[in-house]
Design a protein with these regions (language model features):
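Family-specific signature for flavin-dependent thymidylate synthase
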Residues: 1-197
């Protein structure tokens, strides 16, 4: 398993994108950009804020996992990650197509912080298949222990949806550990509009 930031200078690219939204071209000031003292904490704040300019930073995951796990990972499409998976086409591989869901497949996925965190929200959920959830935990631990501050920050921002929603489950049929987010929203609705119906 490996992660790699695809940007040569993520901090510069991010700050350039931010300045462009303000109508300022900072390309001439490339040497003026300094790394923050607590870079991982800086990135955590930026990732949690989730401004659109953060999408200019991309990173790649490459690994080999059972086909059943790979399919669950690449089907998490919020934030538009870009997956590539080892082909099973007999005319390319010279082998018959396998129906074994546990056959290992090489895959690669390009992510933004947003797309990876959205995938983690889904795949760290207690309702996710155990093998997929355990693989997602491995990915998060790998990110959290990365030497790259941006990747480390992404790892620490990964948690199930219920944690992002203040311990309120967004699923229709959750695991039962937390109350449903929809119940809180419905109660708000009833408190505001019950007399109209």
């Amino acid at each position: 398993m490996r992660f790699r930031v695809l940007n040569t200078s993520p901090l510069f690219d991010y700050q350039e994108a931010n300045k462009i939204t303000q109508g300022v071209d900072v390309f001439k000031e490339i040497y003026a950009i300094k790394n923050p003292k607590k870079e991982t904490e800086f990135w955590i704040k930026q990732i949690v804020a989730n401004h659109s300019t953060l999408r200019c930073i991309h990173f790649r995951l490459v690994d080999e996992q059972p086909k059943s796990v790979v399919m669950q990972i690449i089907r998490a499409t919020k934030g538009h990650p870009q997956p590539e998976v080892q082909s099973s086409r007999p005319d390319w591989t010279g082998k018959e197509r396998s129906s074994d869901p546990y056959e290992d497949k090489l895959f690669m996925q390009d992510n933004t912080a947003e797309s990876f965190i959205e995938m983690a929200k889904q795949r760290l959920c207690n309702r996710t298949e155990e093998k997929t959830r355990q693989f997602m935990y491995q990915l998060v631990i790998t990110l959290r222990t990365s030497e790259v501050p941006f990747l480390r920050a992404v790892g620490f921002c990964c948690m199930p949806s219920c944690k992002w929603n203040g311990n309120r489950c967004p699923e229709v049929r959750g695991c039962g550990r937390f109350n449903k987010l929809s119940d809180y929203i419905i109660q708000d609705y009833r408190d505001c509009y019950i007399e109209e119906e």
